[in-house]
Swiss-Prot record:
Residues 354-373 have a biased composition (Polar residues). The lineage of its organism: Eukaryota, Metazoa, Chordata, Craniata, Vertebrata. The gene is Mtfr2. Residues 224-239 have a biased composition (Pro residues). The keyword Phosphoprotein applies. This is Mitochondrial fission regulator 2. It comes from the Eukaryota. Residues 275-287, 297-310 have a biased composition (Basic and acidic residues). Its main location: mitochondrion.
C-alpha cells in the first residue's frame, strides 16, 4: 500500500508541471489566434510544408508582411545588340584564357558573352563613368561640329564624274529620239563632216529636238513640246552617208580621195578654233551613226513565232529519240575500244572477296555462326 501511495504521488508531481506547460502553450496559441480545439500533432512532424515546426505554424497564422526582395537589372550599353546574339553556354576552361586576355574589362565575363570581332569590342556600361549627360548642350554642340565638316576632294571628283556621265547619256538619248522623229516624219537628211556647229541638216519647222554645245563640249538637251496632231506611221529610217550624194556612179577609190582632199582644203581655210569644233562634231556624229535604230530592232516583233512542241496527254513535252550513232563516230569508237580492253576483267562484286590461291599467311576462314565449344 505504501508503494502504491508513493507511485501516485510521483505521478501527480510529474503531471502538475506537464499540465502547467500545456496550459501555457494553450494560452499562447489562443493569444496568437490558434483555436484550442485544433489538434497539433507535434510528434508527427512532416518533412515538407508549413507544419514542420511550431515556428512555421505561428508564422502562418500571424499577419506579417514579407520583407522586400532586392531586384537587379542589367542596363545594356548605348550600342547594345539584341538578346539573340548572346549564347547561353556552360563556362569551361576555354573561358580562362578569355578572361586573362581581357584586360580592359572591369568585371568577369565569359567568352560567350562577348560580341563578334567584326562588330567591335564589347564595351561595358558603367553609369558612373559617363562624361556628360546625353541631353547636355555640349553633346549637341559636338554633333553640330561633326556635321559641318568639309567634304573631301575625292567625293567632289566622283560627283563631277557622275554628272559628266549623266549629261553624256542624256545627249545620246536625245540624239536617238531625234533620229526616230526624223525617220517617222519621212524627211531625209545626211550628216556631213564639213558642217558648222549643227549636227544634222533639218529644217527648223520640223525639228522636235535641239542640241546646243556648251563651252566644255558636252551637249545639253533642250526638248520642245510634242506636236498636237498624231504622227504618221513609221517609215524605214533614212540611210545616212558620210559622202555627198551624186547622180553619177563614182568608183569608190576616187570618191574617197576626193572627199579627203575637200576636207583637207576646208580645214586649211578655217581657223584653229573651228577645227577643234569640227573634230568634236565629227566624233559626235560618228557616235550617233553607230547607235542602232530601235525601230529596226522592234519592227519584226510581231512576226516572231514559237516552235510547237509535242506533248503527252499529261502535258509533259515528249523527248525525241536520239539517233543511233554510226560505227565511225569517235565516241562509239572510243567506247568499243575501252570495252574490248577491259573485257577480260571480272567486275563482279564478289571478286574482291575471293582469292585465287590460298596463301599460307592468310587468316583461316571462320564460319558465320562462330566457333562452338
Amino acid at each position: 500500500m505504501q508503494r502504491d501511495g508513493t507511485n501516485e504521488q510521483c505521478f501527480l508531481e510529474l503531471a502538475s508541471p506537464m499540465s502547467f506547460i500545456l496550459n501555457i502553450l494553450r494560452n499562447m496559441l489562443a493569444y496568437f489566434g490558434v483555436p484550442v480545439d485544433q489538434d497539433l500533432l507535434i510528434f508527427q512532424n512532416k518533412d515538407y510544408g508549413s507544419a514542420r515546426s511550431i515556428v512555421r505554424v505561428i508564422g502562418r497564422m500571424l499577419p506579417l508582411e514579407p520583407c522586400r526582395r532586392p531586384r537587379f537589372e542589367l542596363t545594356p550599353p548605348a550600342n547594345a545588340k539584341e538578346v539573340d546574339d548572346y549564347e547561353l553556354a556552360v563556362p569551361s576552361f576555354a573561358d580562362v584564357l578569355c578572361v586573362a586576355d581581357d584586360g580592359e574589362a572591369g568585371c568577369l565575363r565569359f567568352r560567350h558573352s562577348l560580341w563578334k570581332k567584326a562588330e567591335g569590342k564589347a564595351a561595358l556600361f558603367h553609369p558612373s563613368k559617363l562624361p556628360w549627360d546625353l541631353s547636355s548642350p555640349a553633346l549637341s554642340q559636338n554633333r553640330t561640329v561633326a556635321d559641318d565638316l568639309p567634304v573631301s576632294e575625292a567625293a567632289i571628283k566622283k560627283i563631277a564624274a557622275l554628272e559628266d556621265e549623266l549629261t553624256s547619256l542624256r545627249a545620246q538619248i536625245a540624239a536617238i529620239v531625234a533620229m526616230q522623229d526624223l525617220g517617222g516624219g519621212g524627211e531625209t537628211g545626211f550628216i556631213s563632216l564639213s558642217d558648222g556647229p549643227s549636227m544634222e541638216q533639218v529644217p527648223p519647222s520640223s525639228a522636235t529636238a535641239r542640241l546646243s554645245v556648251e563651252p566644255d563640249h558636252v551637249p545639253s538637251v533642250v526638248l520642245s513640246p510634242p506636236p498636237l496632231p498624231p504622227p504618221p506611221p513609221p517609215l524605214p529610217p533614212p540611210q545616212f552617208s558620210l559622202q555627198p550624194p551624186s547622180s553619177l556612179p563614182v568608183p569608190p577609190g576616187s570618191a574617197n580621195t576626193r572627199g579627203i582632199d575637200n576636207l583637207a582644203a576646208e580645214m586649211k581655210k578655217r581657223p584653229s578654233g573651228v577645227k577643234k569644233t569640227d573634230g568634236s562634231h565629227h566624233s559626235e556624229s560618228q557616235r550617233v551613226s553607230d547607235v542602232p535604230n530601235m525601230l529596226d530592232v522592234l519592227k519584226d516583233m510581231n512576226k516572231v513565232k514559237l516552235r510547237p512542241v509535242e506533248r503527252s496527254p499529261g502535258g509533259r513535252p515528249i523527248q525525241k529519240r536520239r539517233r543511233q550513232s554510226s560505227q565511225w563516230d569517235p565516241v562509239s569508237l572510243i567506247s568499243n575500244a575501252l570495252k574490248q580492253k577491259f573485257a577480260f576483267q571480272d567486275d563482279s562484286f564478289d571478286s574482291e572477296n575471293r582469292s585465287w590461291q590460298g596463301s599460307p599467311f592468310s587468316s583461316p576462314e571462320t564460319s558465320r555462326n562462330g566457333s562452338r565449344f
